[in-house]
């Protein structure tokens, strides 16, 4: 019996020894990569049959509780379309606490792979749904809200990721969120933690090129997502053309379901640090601005929901000099434009007009054309400019604006627009536009006009055809510089433009000019002007309108022009109660009249007055008339200054006559040494091409200094080479 027990004991010992050896061999065999690969291939072959889809793993290396290393992982969907093709996957494990619903991973590396995600055109089903269906539990599982995953490091290198919703059409330009393709995708992230629906991570590097052409050089940020929303901190986004810093971007929610109603429920709380943004990068996400490719520099705070988004303390720079500081409240763009409410404020701005003209606009949009007359402003410096209301009823005000033309301020005005046109008027019944040191002459290219200071109010309407109507225009001009004189206290009243007719009143109460006038001007191409002026007093020398000293003028003037064009026009002027005083002499005329007629090259001018009558008729060639006459008079009187020997003849061919009436006071003022009897007559003709000037003089009496002549009869004809007469 003892022997039997010894034999049995020995046999059991030998069996245990071999069993231990077998266990040791088995353990080492399982840890061998080729064994693990063989097992994996058998498992994937079985899985392929179960899924009716190709699943392959090229090589496996697993160390229990240490790491999992997979190579050449490939998965197809049942339609034989690739879902995953991965060259290398490495998973470094740290702790796996099944009972505590916690998984801690040291490292996850994905290298050289392609991931294809699609949604079916028929029902929107994802192409990986067959995997979810196979591995899902038959009965509802316990909530995973307490499951926690910690991943110390995630690296993705040289990856390709695509997403296509086959139910949606593809956009021709820009990032299409229904058809995404990320090439050369590289990602490095640390401190990744998920618990339930929450996620936190530190993005160290994110790079890719999207199929649209948008290229991301790098993105760094601290990110978190939960039921309370999405939060990015200390984000830095870089593209080849843009560098954007976002210290804070929070999309706040009460529930993750709020993202399904993004415009109304998700609240923005963001700060954009001073950043360089290339508009071409923005165009990939807003195709409407495609073609805009310049850099802008901006910073600011973004608040509230998208339906009432506020951009506070916005700083915007573009071009060489333009800078804008503003507070903006964007409207709800989902509403019809008539119900979109604007409330915008430019606190400070320097706008360079050349920067505006050089701005690249979206494709198909004409470049900004700055009107020639406005280009003279060069720039605008604005302070506290405000705009509020709807597109059809806007209120605009500008506390202060300065340009190369001068300064202006604009009290609140109302701009109403409808299908029939636009109407602009002041909110209050008072002047709303003030101009200071305004270079009116520079604006109008009239060098004789200088600065203007004044205040204006008006109501302006522009209909759909571009017709302009001005109502109730009034202005109080503190000063207007004209012809080297600064006129003060000018008033414009009851001015209007209607049916292309301008009607208005002008009143001047300057120390050297007191007058009132009524104007009626046709703004069309055909001249039609009517002007009535009552000049109570005008100190002409002080106004730089006369070289004499202390001369004064007064009259009631009626002036008009009428005709289909300036080449066929009739004009008249009447001066009643004309008084002109210089030194101790005065001229008075109860009525003086001038009639003017022009038809093509033919002109006729008639002047009649108690002082003298004058008539000229024919082809005048006004632009060269003076030089023409001086040339011919120099033949008879060579000392005439300005005469030239070489001369090009004009078309001038006219007759003229002058008859004196009561000229004594006129001569006392301008030629005090000359006396000319009444009924003195000067008449003649001039033909430039024939080089012929005829002058005839009939004078009862003429006295000059100590000389005195009576019964004078004089006739002279001047040719190009001689003069004769009697």
PLM feature spans:
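N-terminal type II signal-anchor transmembrane helix
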Residues: 1-51
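Flexible beta-edge/linker motif
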Residues: 32, 58-125, 133-166, 181-204, ...
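Hydrophobic residues on conserved beta-strands that form the core of alpha/beta folds
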Residues: 57, 70, 86, 105, ...
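Amphipathic hydrophobic-ligand
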Residues: 79-93, 168-187, 211-222, 228-229, ...
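Gram-negative outer-membrane beta-barrel proteins
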Residues: 114-118, 162-167, 209, 276-280, ...
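Tryptophan-anchored aromatic micro-motifs
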Residues: 151-159, 474, 535, 575, ...
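Transmembrane beta-strand segments that form the barrel wall of outer-membrane beta-barrel proteins
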Residues: 203-206, 230-236, 308-316, 393-401, ...
